[in-house]
Amino acid sequence: MFEYELTLPSESDAEALIHVENECFSIPLTVEQISAQIRDERFILICARNSKQELVAYAGMYYVLDEGYITNVAVLPEARRLHAADALMEKLEQMSVEKGLSFISLEVRESNTPAISLYEKHGYKTAGIRKDYYQAPKENALIMTKKLSEEKN
């Protein structure tokens, strides 16, 4: 299994994060949006770096009160199926429990079966559908959720 160093980003990581965004999403975030997330105290952003210290993946989550909302899990194509997303999901959950969150949700494209499998593997359940949520191309989103409260007791 590949080992990743999981780090919190600094402003100097914005360009590398944008590279991952551009490789993974049809409508990527801008440098300004990424920089705002890095500075936002209610946003958790975790980077996965390979043995060469290259940023190959990241995950982001907003949280308010006891709820978290995963905005992105992005992995460069050459790093997929090498467990970077697993490491990021585990770290997000660990940090969520540490912050006292009891519930996490996310949206995922209906056609993104690898991501759906990843989320199910980590205990997420489909809770509903958002019609035409995604653009470029237009597609429904599955709403997936996970309760953490039982794990805190």
What is the predicted role of each segment?
Residues 2-78, 89-91, 95, 99, ...:
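Acetyl-CoA-dependent GNAT
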Residues 75, 81-95, 113, 117-121:
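Conserved acetyl-CoA-binding loop-helix of GNAT-fold acetyltransferases
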